[in-house]
Structure formats: structure tokens, C-alpha cells
């Protein structure tokens, strides 16, 4: 079954909801990055969160989430677009911590002090950038806090990852609910009560519930309608041309030193782990082009 995202809006237009099943793409990301259990859950939550936030964008826009805490997992970066692609990486994929109350200590892995930085490319000359402090380091609450404080849109975010003992992901998904301005405090309180009594996201997915069914539970008695669906996938936008541009950015002198010392270059994409090889003649061609420009 392919991953999917569903959008709904209340009939009065005051509340917008998104839910997604990201089980396959999170498994793909974990496979590519060869992550341990702690990193699998943290990266899975971050990818799912970026998918949900990416669904708020339009057209060719995209966003990047960067979690920079003081925990052993290090930096986590994820990117997503409104058409359903995402990619990401985690700095220390094999970092581990003792269980906390019988559960993986994701907050400890991310670190209790740090920042969430959001960068959006919305087609303007300058990219939009916003930041907020990590409030729980559980990722979902941090995204909700960012949306509520930095973007001034009251939001609730739920993320769930169910890890199999063999290291694969049994279920992954999440939801994002936003109260559109002007905020309806009574409606928000009603939905918060519903959310507090819901089963976990991962358990609903394991029970075979679709994103639409999850949204129906979230909205409860609030009349709402579906506004669209998107298929989701883990997809990297790297290319040999982009990696060549990375080499070009080093400059002719540094490339000449690299050619002398190693005779070739390997450039690894952090997001998908694909390795791009540049032979000595490739490096020399780049150096010659740079010298002709100068």
C-alpha cells in the first residue's frame, strides 16, 4: 500500500486538517541511512512532520526543517514539497541511549536544548526563514510550537512511529490541525479534548485506518469535507550536475590541490547516500573551465 496524505477542511472554513501514512517512505529513509532504533524514530518523526508542513505550501514551493539539539543524534534535516516528495538525513544514525521508562528516549537523543529552524522557498528572491526553541524535543510538539508562535497559526501536531524489533518500521504517520483566523477558541478546546482521547497514530495505522479515517476521528462531530489527496515518496533531488557545482564552489586552487593529493574525488549526497565519482580528467576539466573564467 502506497503512502498517502489527505486534506480536509471544516464546513465553516475555520479548521484545516491534514493526515498522512508515511510508513513506506520512512522505511526507505531508514534503509538508505542504515539507522539504529533511536535515529529511526527521530528521523521518521522529522520526515513525517516535514511532509505535513510541506502540504501547506503550493506549486513548486518547498521547505526545510532543521533540528539542532545538544543530544547525541546531532543535526536532523528534512525537506518536503506540496507534491509529496521528501528527503532527510540525521548526523549520527547509530547514536543510542538507555531506554527511558521502557521507551526510546527521542527527546534525549535530539537534546533538550536547541533550535528548530524552518526555511521556505516560496518563489521570492529571498527564502523565508524562521526559528523557535525546542520545547520538548519530541519533534511533533516542537513543530506545533513553531507554527503557533512563529507563524501565529494555532496548530496541533501528532506524529507516530511504531518500530519493529527487527529494525523496520511497522507504522508511521501523523496529523496537523490548524485553526484558521480568526481563531475559534471553543472549537480549539473541543478538538484538543478529542485529540487527548485518541488512540496513538501508529496504532490507528496498524489497525488499517486511512488518513481520511484518522481525520474523521479528529474532527468528530465537526462537519468537514475532503479537499484532496497526495501520494508520498522518499525522493532525492541530487544529480551529478549539482555535485559538480559543489566542487566548483571550492575554487580552482583547492581543486588543483585535491587533484594532486588524491587524483580523483568522491562526493556523497547526505540525503540519499549516492556516491558521485569524478576522475582526474573530470577534475582537470573543471579546473580549466574555472581558469578560463578568471
From Swiss-Prot:
InterPro entries: Heat_shock_Hsp33, Heat_shock_Hsp33_C, Heat_shock_Hsp33_N. Redox regulated molecular chaperone. Protects both thermally unfolding and oxidatively damaged proteins from irreversible aggregation. Plays an important role in the bacterial defense system toward oxidative stress. Disulfide bonds join 236-238, 269-272. GO terms for cellular component: cytoplasm. Under oxidizing conditions two disulfide bonds are formed involving the reactive cysteines. Under reducing conditions zinc is bound to the reactive cysteines and the protein is inactive. Keywords: Chaperone, Cytoplasm, Disulfide bond, Redox-active center, Zinc. The gene is hslO. Belongs to the HSP33 family. One of its GO terms (molecular function) is protein folding chaperone. It comes from the Bacteria. HAMAP family: HslO. It is found in: Cytoplasm. PANTHER family: 33 KDA CHAPERONIN. This is 33 kDa chaperonin. GO terms for biological process: protein refolding.
Amino acid at each position: 500500500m502506497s503512502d498517502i496524505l489527505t486534506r480536509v477542511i471544516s464546513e465553516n472554513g475555520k479548521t484545516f486538517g491534514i493526515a498522512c501514512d508515511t510508513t513506506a517512505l520512512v522505511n526507505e529513509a531508514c534503509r538508505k541511512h542504515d539507522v539504529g532504533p533511536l535515529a529511526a524514530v527521530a528521523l521518521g518523526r522529522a520526515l513525517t512532520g516535514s511532509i505535513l508542513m510541506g502540504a501547506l505550501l503550493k506549486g513548486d514551493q518547498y521547505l526545510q526543517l532543521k533540528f539542532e539539539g545538544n543530544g547525541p543524534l546531532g543535526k536532523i534535516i528534512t525537506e518536503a514539497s506540496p507534491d509529496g516528495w521528501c528527503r532527510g538525513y540525521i548526523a549520527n544514525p547509530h547514536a543510542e541511549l538507555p531506554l527511558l521508562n521502557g521507551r526510546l528516549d527521542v527527546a534525549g537523543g535530539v537534546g533538550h536544548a536547541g533550535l528548530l529552524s524552518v526555511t521556505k522557498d516560496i518563489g521570492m528572491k529571498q527564502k523565508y526563514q524562521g526559528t523557535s526553541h525546542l520545547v520538548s524535543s519530541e519533534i511533533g510538539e516542537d513543530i506545533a510550537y513553531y507554527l503557533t508562535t512563529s507563524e501565529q497559526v494555532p496548530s496541533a501536531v501528532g506524529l507516530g512511529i511504531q518500530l519493529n524489533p527487527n529494525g523496520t518500521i511497522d507504522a508511521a504517520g501523523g496529523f496537523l490541525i490548524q485553526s484558521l483566523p480568526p481563531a475559534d477558541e471553543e472549537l480549539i478546546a473541543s478538538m484538543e479534548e478529542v485529540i487527548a482521547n485518541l488512540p496513538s497514530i501508529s496504532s490507528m495505522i496498524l489497525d488499517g485506518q486511512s488518513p481520511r479515517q484518522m481525520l474523521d476521528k479528529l474532527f468528530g462531530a465537526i462537519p468537514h469535507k475532503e479537499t484532496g489527496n497526495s501520494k508520498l515518496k522518499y525522493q532525492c533531488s541530487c544529480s551529478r550536475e549539482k555535485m559538480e557545482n559543489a566542487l566548483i564552489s571550492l575554487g580552482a586552487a583547492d581543486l588543483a590541490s585535491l587533484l594532486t593529493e588524491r587524483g580523483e574525488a568522491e562526493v556523497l549526497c547526505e540525503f540519499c547516500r549516492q556516491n558521485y565519482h569524478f576522475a582526474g580528467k573530470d577534475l582537470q576539466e573543471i579546473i580549466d573551465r574555472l581558469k578560463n573564467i578568471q
